[in-house]
Amino acid sequence: MSPKLDLIYFDVRARAECARMTLAYGGIQYNFTDTQGYFGCDFMTAKTSGKLPWGQLPLLAVDGQLISQSGSINRYVASLVTKPDFIPKNPVKAALADALHETAQDLFRIMPIVNLWTEEK
């Protein structure tokens, strides 16, 4: 049975976009929500009350177990994709794919405003 997945983030692309795209590509069902929808309170309240591991988003709830850090989330959701060769079996090719992922993460630091667009302009 597939786990119940809740991806918790703000309504922007940024750090949750890779997980969203991977889940969509894999045809994996999940619920996208914000802190209000998942915890019943706004981000700052969730943060100050200790509901957020490391005090930040995104989070992925897997059957209620919270996973933090976008890289960890991305690698977990990639492991759920059943399409052939999505994660290379060759260790060098897998490392190259992971390096590409890390490079994409670096881009968020140098062009943050691009990651706020959520629709075609």
Where are these regions (language model features)?
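GST-like domain detector, emphasizing the conserved glutathione-binding G-site
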Residues: 1-121
